[in-house]
Amino acid sequence: MTKKITLVSTPIGNLKDISLRALDTLRDSDIILCEDTRVSQKLLNHYQINNKKLISYHKFNEYKMLDLIDNYLNQGLQICLISDAGVPTISDPGQILVNWAHENDIEVDIIPGANALISAFALSGYKGSFYFGGFLDSKKQQIIKQISLLDPKVSYIFYISPFKLVYTLEIIRDLYGEEIDIFLIKEITKIYQKYYRGTPDKILNNLSAPKGEFTIILKLKEKKSIKKNKYEQFSKVK
């Protein structure tokens, strides 16, 4: 008997953004571990996936649930993990479970799908590599620590609360002024999806009633180097 846990990616807004494999896995699972069973039930109802045992699995009970999950696996039950939106473990519960599974020779599989940070980076138009820092902190000194010493060759992606958005943009402006470009997008894949791109001041001037889920990308502007002609001093006419 092979013990196995499957991570299933779910839509981040538009319920149509779910794969056929994800739906098949949800239908075939005996136990569905959910960040919030109420949110997950809406998705299952939409696709008429009925009579499933949903178990609340979140950051406050991750360790406590391991013995119960192990018991289910020993019974030969099929288990999958979903978060409220997107890929499990990415700024969501699940890393403890996955590490535990690896340490106990339990197979882990994943059904890929919609992801806010990848979608935001694709829409930004920024080139090069990127770094994902999870959620930006709410305290000023921690925010400064998170966004200090940026490399202009790297895009820095964070999730951010709408309640701290203006406050954070002002901190970024005070730190970098016009020397940084920002791509800010809210409600990815939803009806009210909207994005902004520009300097902190430009975005602050255009931002209205920040509500919803935001992803922010910071891109430090590269300083253009002026190449000097080493023969210039010899070419001047005297």
From Swiss-Prot:
Keywords noted in UniProt: Cytoplasm, Methyltransferase, rRNA processing, S-adenosyl-L-methionine, Transferase
Coiled coil regions, renumbered to chain: none
Higher taxonomy: Bacteria, Bacillati, Mycoplasmatota, Mycoplasmoidales, Metamycoplasmataceae
Gene name linked to the record: rsmI
The organism's place on the tree of life at top rank: Bacteria
Family label: Belongs to the methyltransferase superfamily. RsmI family.
Subcellular location: Cytoplasm
Native species: Mesomycoplasma conjunctivae (strain ATCC 25834 / NCTC 10147 / HRC/581) (Mycoplasma conjunctivae)
Pfam families recorded: TP_methylase
GO terms, molecular function: rRNA (cytosine-2'-O-)-methyltransferase activity
The protein's name: Ribosomal RNA small subunit methyltransferase I
CDD domains: RsmI (cd11648)
